[in-house]
């Protein structure tokens, strides 16, 4: 089958040319995502930040450094779409608000999410990163706070894992909730090794 006939590539081409939200994106349109029909791990984030908007590389920032450390993966594995898919709730940088980046645009999920999720039949683990991703992917089990949802991570394990956003802005949260890095991160790393070693 030619690349042009590949449903994943066809859909990615459409997504990357989407400008539906252009009037609401002060820095312009630049959808950032990666996936393959063979992806085994799915990372569901919020939306690209300013640096990622500039480079077009998902999690190419301090948040990504921490996320890769939590997962215990190399850059080579992280950016290999055959292994890891990255599908933020919003594909474009939404701009800055008074207290950080604005929330992801809701249009992305409405327009593309179900179609894209259907193109990844081999996902064994979904990392659900931050409150916006949790609200969509764990809507039935979302607790009153992100902390409460993450504390009940075993209820979704080993196929899904809600985690806080790895942004440096969450350093205080991580200090207050040391159990995350002592209990959850080692389990995550073991699961990632198990999945990737099976399919390497």
Model regions: which residues?
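A polyanion-binding, active-site-adjacent surface
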Residues: 2-196
